[in-house]
Structures are given as structure tokens and as C-alpha cells.
């Protein structure tokens, strides 16, 4: 299980990404627009660099909702592979059945 502080850090990052998402998208659009002048694109890049480090979506990590495990997490369920297995065998995940062919 991941420490509670790790889970809280990830939650804080998600909130920062959501807070700065609009500004981030606007600046990225300016930077990637070839029709803009070099000076405008340069100032947009400087403004992007002044955003908080944790405001970048690339710093987010998918974690298991139950354990906080960072690897082996399925997006569909939001759970780690071992927790999916446990819950599926108990029958707690609707529609998931053991495969047989």
C-alpha cells in the first residue's frame, strides 16, 4: 500500500492540473501555431515555464483507488491488477467473469 502522503500528493497534482488546464491549453495552442510570430510564441513559452511544475498533465500518475499502487493499474476500473483479481473472484465487479474457452 502506498503511503497516505503519496496519495495526497497525487490528489494535489490533479487539482493543480485542473486549475491551470485552460491557461495551459491556450499557451500550448499559441506555441504550436505556426501563423504566430516568433516573439509571440517565445513569450508564450516563457509564460508556460512560469506555471507551477505540478500543473503539467504529464506529471500525473494513474494509481489504484484502493491501494495507491502506481503500476499495473487498469484505467477501466481504476484498480490495480491484483485488486481486480480479488474483487472479481468475490463477484464484487459486475459483469466480470472468469474466462473459459
Curated annotation (Swiss-Prot):
Q: Which GO terms describe its molecular function?
A: rRNA binding; structural constituent of ribosome
Cite the Pfam families for this sequence. Answer: Ribosomal_S14 (PF00253)
Q: Which UniProt keywords apply?
A: Ribonucleoprotein, Ribosomal protein, RNA-binding, rRNA-binding
Q: Biological process GO terms, please?
A: translation
Assigned GO CC terms: cytoplasm; small ribosomal subunit
What's this protein's family per the entry? Belongs to the universal ribosomal protein uS14 family.
How would you summarize the oligomeric state and partners of this protein? Part of the 30S ribosomal subunit. Contacts proteins S3 and S10.
* PANTHER family linked to this entry: 30S RIBOSOMAL PROTEIN S14 (PTHR19836), SMALL RIBOSOMAL SUBUNIT PROTEIN US14M (PTHR19836:SF19)
Q: What does this protein do?
A: Binds 16S rRNA, required for the assembly of 30S particles and may also be responsible for determining the conformation of the 16S rRNA at the A site.
Q: What HAMAP family has UniProt attached to this entry? A: Ribosomal_uS14_1 (MF_00537)
Name of the featured protein: Small ribosomal subunit protein uS14
Gene name, per UniProt, is rpsN
Amino acid at each position: 500500500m502506498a503511503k497516505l502522503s503519496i496519495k495526497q500528493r497525487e490528489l494535489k497534482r490533479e487539482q493543480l492540473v485542473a486549475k491551470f488546464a485552460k491557461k495551459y491549453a491556450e499557451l500550448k495552442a499559441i506555441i504550436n501555431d505556426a501563423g504566430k510570430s516568433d516573439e509571440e510564441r517565445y513569450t508564450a513559452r516563457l509564460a508556460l515555464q512560469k506555471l507551477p511544475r505540478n500543473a503539467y498533465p504529464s506529471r500525473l500518475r494513474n494509481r489504484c483507488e484502493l491501494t495507491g499502487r502506481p503500476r499495473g493499474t487498469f484505467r477501466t476500473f481504476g484498480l490495480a491488477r491484483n485488486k481486480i483479481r480479488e474483487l472479481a473472484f468475490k463477484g464484487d465487479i459486475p459483469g466480470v467473469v472468469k474466462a473459459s474457452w
